[in-house]
Structure formats: structure tokens, C-alpha cells
Design a protein with these regions (language model features):
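Conserved, mostly hydrophobic/aromatic
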Residues: 39, 117, 185
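Aromatic- and acidic-residue-enriched carbohydrate-binding clefts of CAZyme catalytic domains
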Residues: 55-112, 127-165, 194-207
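Active-site beta-loop-alpha junctions enriched in small/polar residues
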Residues: 21-23, 52-56, 122-126, 188-192
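Short, well-ordered coil/turn segments that N-cap beta-strands
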Residues: 14, 43-45, 111-115, 179-183
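Mature N-terminal, pre-catalytic/accessory segment of carbohydrate-active enzymes
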Residues: 1-45
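Carboxylate/His-rich catalytic cores and anion/metal-binding grooves
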Residues: 43-58, 113-120, 124
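Aromatic/hydrophobic pocket-lining residues that form π-stacking "cages" and hydrophobic walls in ligand
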Residues: 35, 106, 117
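Active-site groove signature of glycoside hydrolases
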Residues: 123, 167-194
Length: 207
């Protein structure tokens, strides 16, 4: 007696989010390729790549090199429990980012296996690493540090013309790397604390 196996995806979109905000894995290009192999085997067809965060900017941007010189690295990382008093940090510089060459290699590898890579560039929240790299993007105009721990932070993009120009430039470089018709722009967890105290933001709100 012959058996017939019918194998198909359950949903039109089978998505997997890959988040490296906290850690850059050693030899991570090869690691990601192995992950993609596993996703293909399990019939996933979308690889959602979380590339920017408060704790680190993980994608090369040529027009704004300080995103990688400053924003891709933090001076310390929380160790122990978030609720510890006092909190403990390792006081060790840590970070890294993916070059455009590496990203193209990963996207090509995924596409050959039927997987679409969707980049995520967070805005307006989860942008502390970017604001630290280019302080004019924030309400205070001052460096704020790349976040050394997880959480939701008040340092978000300010509604200045410079900010919108910056974000448009970022998106222009990102879409050149990813053939996906989608790009994720976050939109979550954006405290309005600084906006409420910012004259520029209040003027925009009142328009």
C-alpha cells in the first residue's frame, strides 16, 4: 500500500521575527543562513529582520556613518535581573552591525529558499541609538547614550524637518538592499514625555 503525503502552509504568510537588538552573534551571517534553512524546512516564507533599537543600530548606512560608529555600540550591558537594586552592568563595550554586503548575501540566500526578508527600522520610538548618534534628531539636541538595558525609553525622534529628512534617507538606503515590497517601521512603545515638553513638537501638534 502506497502512502501519499500532502504538505502545505497553513497561512498565506508564515512569519518569523529575528531580533538582534541586544546581541550580535559571532559568525552571525552563517548562523542566520542556518536559521533560514530551518525556516524553509518549516515552510516559513517571511523573515522579519529587526535591525534597529535603543540598544544598538545593526545595519550599515553610508550617508550617516555615526549610526555605526556610535549607535551600533553600547558602553555596558545589564547583567543580573532587571529588578535588582542597584542594577549591575558589565561595563564592557559591545556591539556591531551588518554591512550592506552581508545583508545582500543573506537576502539572496533567503530568496533562493523562497523566503522574503522584511527589514524593520523602528520609528518614532525605540530610536535611542540613532538619537545618540545624531543628537539633532531628539528633542533635547543632546547625546543620550545607547541604552545598556531593555525597556521603553523616552528618547524618541523629534518632529523636526531634519528628522524626516533623516528617515527618508534611511529608507532610501534600506529599500535598495531588500527586494521585499514591505518594510516594517515599528510604531510601538513611543512615550510622549519629551514631545509634551518640546516646543517644536507642540507646534507641530497644534497645526
Amino acid at each position: 500500500m502506497k502512502n501519499k503525503i500532502i504538505d502545505c502552509i497553513t497561512f498565506f504568510n508564515e512569519n518569523f521575527i529575528f531580533d538582534l537588538r541586544y546581541n550580535i552573534i559571532k559568525d552571525s551571517v552563517d548562523f542566520i543562513k542556518k536559521y533560514i534553512d530551518g525556516l524553509a524546512m518549516l515552510k516559513f516564507n517571511n523573515f522579519h529582520w529587526h535591525l534597529t533599537e535603543d540598544q544598538g543600530w545593526r545595519i550599515e548606512i553610508e550617508k550617516y556613518p555615526e549610526l555605526n560608529n556610535i549607535g551600533s555600540f553600547r558602553d555596558s550591558t545589564l547583567i543580573g535581573h532587571y529588578g535588582d537594586k542597584p542594577r549591575q552592568f558589565d561595563k564592557s563595550r559591545y556591539g556591531g552591525f551588518y554591512t550592506k554586503k552581508e545583508i545582500k548575501e543573506i537576502v539572496k540566500y533567503a530568496n533562493k529558499r523562497g523566503i522574503n526578508v522584511i527589514p524593520e527600522i523602528e520609528m518614532p520610538g525605540h530610536s535611542q541609538a540613532a538619537v545618540d548618534s545624531y543628537p539633532m534628531l531628539g528633542c533635547s539636541g543632546e547625546q543620550v547614550g545607547v541604552a545598556p538595558l531593555w525597556g521603553v525609553f523616552k528618547e524618541i525622534y523629534c518632529s523636526k524637518n531634519e528628522t524626516f529628512d533623516f528617515l527618508e534617507d534611511i529608507i532610501d538606503e534600506v529599500v535598495e538592499l531588500f527586494p521585499s515590497k514591505y518594510i516594517h517601521i515599528g510604531g510601538d512603545e513611543a512615550p510622549k514625555t519629551n514631545w509634551k515638553a518640546c516646543g517644536n513638537c507642540q507646534d507641530v501638534i497644534k497645526r
